Amino acid sequence: MAGKKVCIVGSGDWGSAIAKIVGGNAAQLAQFDPRVTMWVFEEDIGGKKLTEIINTHQENVKYLPGHKLPPNVVAVPDVVKAAADADILIFVVPHQFIGKICDEIKGHLKANAIGISLIKGVNEGPKGLKLISEVIGEHLGIPMSVLMGANIASEVADEKFCETTIGCKDQAQGQLLKQLMQTPNFRIVVTQEVNTVEICGALKDLVAVGAGFCDGIGFGDNTKAAVIRLGLMEMIAFAKLFCSGPVSPATFLESCGVADLITTCYGGRNRKVAEAFARTGKSIEQLEKEMLNGQKLQGPETARELHSILQHKGLVDWFPLFMAVYKVCYQGQPVGEFIRCLQNHPEHM
């Protein structure tokens, strides 16, 4: 029986780090076709196309320099050609671009294809919250799982030990995805609470922006610990309000929950850029260009989406930390006001 074909939709630092793992496993495991396609948004790097550089030198020199990709990972600039034959689609692009990508590949996929989203963020739907996996699943008519965890891309690429969480309602599919993605240094726990896993992944970036604000104005680890605790409480409250399925406290103790929150608040790009925002006064857009090679930051965008959702539901006052991040990012509120939000949080009244 032919092995299942895999396509990675996206090629930033996280997409490339996952390609390193998936390419290695697909080359060794009989249940997968060894050729893995990776859709790459074509860019010109020093007069050469990025796809040509990746396919010639097995390295994404722009987004994951210094790390060799397996030779069986093939960069493809056309997303339809990359995805057309895939049995398993791994989505790992900034969440604001997923609708356009789904429009392009809709109608070109295998009938029995399945997907897994590594995308962190939420959308606003007609009834409020719309998870990215739901957007993809409804657009493409395929079953969707999610992967979220304490996984800084550079450390995963360096093969430093970490854990992650797959949320998958179908047990057999969950085990297949685990086989595709697990290594001795990338250990996976599978749970059926898909929505909770995904909400954890989306909201932690927003909390990390708040942690970065604290760093930028010179507050210490005690303050950051308060941000993490209050942020986790708001994450749990949000999940209980908006998740259609069960929300168990145990899921927040998996890698997708408190572990991802901690690592992102200390080491992630959202924290780093938010710190620079607080220190320099430069715009988020300018800092994305300077610090992220133009890659998009998820935390501020998630704050904007949440503000719209919560305002529509009349629940803005229920999530003061989330909304304080929004006000600093989008309404020009001074960063110091974020500290006043912590001081006056309902938890302390």
Swiss-Prot record:
Binding site for substrate: K120, R269, N270
Residues annotated as binding NAD(+): G10, S11, G12, D13, W14, G15, K120, A153, R269, K296, Q298
InterPro entries for this protein: 6-PGluconate_DH-like_C_sf, 6PGD_dom2, G3P_DH_NAD-dep, G3P_DH_NAD-dep_C, G3P_DH_NAD-dep_euk, G3P_DH_NAD-dep_N, NAD(P)-bd_dom_sf
Main localization, broad class: cytoplasm
Localization, UniProt: Cytoplasm
Any Pfam family: NAD_Gly3P_dh_N
GO cellular component term, pick one: cytosol
Modified residues (Phosphotyrosine): Y326
Homology family: Belongs to the NAD-dependent glycerol-3-phosphate dehydrogenase family.
UniProt subunit comment: Homodimer.
PANTHER family: GLYCEROL-3-PHOSPHATE DEHYDROGENASE, GLYCEROL-3-PHOSPHATE DEHYDROGENASE [NAD(+)], CYTOPLASMIC
Protein name listed in UniProt: Glycerol-3-phosphate dehydrogenase [NAD(+)], cytoplasmic
Species assigned in the record: Oryctolagus cuniculus (Rabbit)
